[in-house]
């Protein structure tokens, strides 16, 4: 999914969500995320870790840590989380924001707070802080591209 977003490959993105055509909400989500990746203009992506934060029945809350390798060869640390659901075909698909219930959201927030105490999250936070200190104004530059 991360690589599909970076390349702007909408058919591959929709496949990760298990849909052939995105509804308006999902399409907005896809468009915003593709635009976010385009704003960074990465040369490549390096996936660091991908694992579950928690599992509940057919639902799993996943995290992915990765670096966007920029044109100056610096690595911009990122973390993304996704709620996935195991469907009847035994494949997991990402849930769109509109498919996530309030209860799922609350549980995810609680579990994410615990996840923030793990080594994986601490490493991401350390790497991110180092990048921002070396590149003051980077976030503002990206934010201005997203307006």
Predicted regions and their residues:
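Short, aromatic-enriched amphipathic alpha-helices that serve as compact interaction elements
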Residues: 1-12, 124-134
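Short solvent-exposed beta->alpha transition segments
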Residues: 11-61, 71-74
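Hydrophobic/aromatic beta-strand elements that line small-molecule binding cavities or substrate pockets
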Residues: 47-53, 79-86
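Beta-strand elements of well-folded, non-transmembrane domains
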Residues: 66-70, 84, 88
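"Short basic amphipathic alpha-helical interaction patches in structured regions
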Residues: 76-81, 97-99
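Low-complexity, intrinsically disordered terminal/linker segments enriched in charged
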Residues: 94-147
């Amino acid at each position: 999914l991360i690589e599909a977003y970076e390349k702007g490959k909408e058919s591959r993105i929709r496949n990760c969500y298990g849909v052939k055509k995105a509804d308006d909400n999902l399409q907005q989500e896809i468009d915003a995320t593709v635009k976010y990746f385009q704003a960074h203009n990465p040369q490549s992506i390096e996936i660091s870790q991908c694992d579950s934060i928690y599992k509940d029945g057919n639902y799993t809350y996943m995290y992915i840590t990765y670096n966007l390798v920029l044109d100056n060869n610096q690595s911009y640390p990122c973390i993304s989380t996704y709620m996935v659901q195991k469907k009847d075909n035994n494949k997991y698909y990402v849930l769109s924001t509109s498919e996530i219930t309030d209860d799922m959201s609350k549980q995810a927030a609680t579990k994410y707070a615990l996840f923030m105490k793990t080594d994986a999250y601490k490493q991401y936070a350390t790497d991110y802080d180092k990048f921002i200190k070396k590149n003051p104004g980077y976030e503002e530059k990206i934010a201005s591209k997203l307006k």
